[in-house]
């Protein structure tokens, strides 16, 4: 019996013939679930272009160029996107809401990450602008003061999610991966044709 993790698991180890601690069994089960999700996604949703070139996913950041933006860039560059195999993530940015809206008009961008308040506007202004696009991006609000009120307001007005700052890599990867999958699965046929 392990005092911290409880009794050993009853299943016998195939390789050693000894009982495995519950923690080891849990870790192996978690690893298998992640592996199964990756296999299912790679079989069902290969985001490459058919020539084994990864799909490029652009995250457009609206807000100041600060340490948080550099952290976000590092997360995008160093992450293995297990939920979105066959993707390459890039970051574009603008610190001005009106300039961002103008730039987004000419591009197909799946995800917009917007600071709660930015130069000459708020996330609500960006949401209103991108809401008119044929394939509107998933808007994610970022804030150091992310609370239940902001989360409820953002979701009720049509934002996809809220990320708290400073950015935590696992949470950023989870939210961005789910936003990308949601965007690709809900695009209209007309928007798909326009993007291709």
Predicted regions and their residues:
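A short, hydrophobic beta-strand element within the central beta-sheet of small alpha/beta folds
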Residues: 136-146
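C-terminal output helix
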Residues: 167-176
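CheY-like receiver
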Residues: 26, 33, 41, 55, ...
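Conserved phosphotransfer cores of two-component systems
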Residues: 105-107, 129-136, 157
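Conserved acidic segment of CheY-like receiver
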Residues: 54-77, 90-93, 112-113
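Conserved phosphotransfer microenvironments
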Residues: 97-100, 110-133, 147
């Amino acid at each position: 019996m392990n005092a911290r993790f409880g009794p050993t698991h009853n299943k016998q180890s195939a390789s050693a013939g000894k009982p495995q601690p519950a923690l080891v069994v849990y870790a192996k089960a978690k690893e298998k679930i992640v592996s199964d999700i990756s296999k299912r996604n790679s079989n069902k949703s290969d985001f490459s272009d058919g020539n084994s070139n990864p799909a490029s996913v652009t995250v457009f950041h609206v807000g100041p160029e600060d340490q948080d933006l550099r952290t976000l860039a590092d997360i995008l560059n160093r992450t293995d996107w297990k939920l979105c195999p066959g993707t390459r993530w890039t970051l574009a940015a603008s610190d001005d809401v009106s300039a961002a809206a103008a730039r987004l008009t000419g591009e197909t961008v799946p995800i917009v990450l917007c600071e709660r308040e930015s130069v000459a506007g708020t996330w609500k202004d960006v949401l209103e602008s991108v809401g008119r696009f044929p394939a509107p991006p998933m808007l994610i609000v970022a804030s150091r003061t992310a609370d239940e009120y902001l989360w409820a307001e953002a979701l009720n007005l049509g934002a996809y999610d809220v990320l708290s700052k400073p950015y935590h890599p696992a949470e950023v990867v989870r939210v961005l991966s789910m936003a990308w999958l949601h965007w690709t699965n809900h695009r209209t046929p007309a928007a798909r044709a326009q993007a291709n």
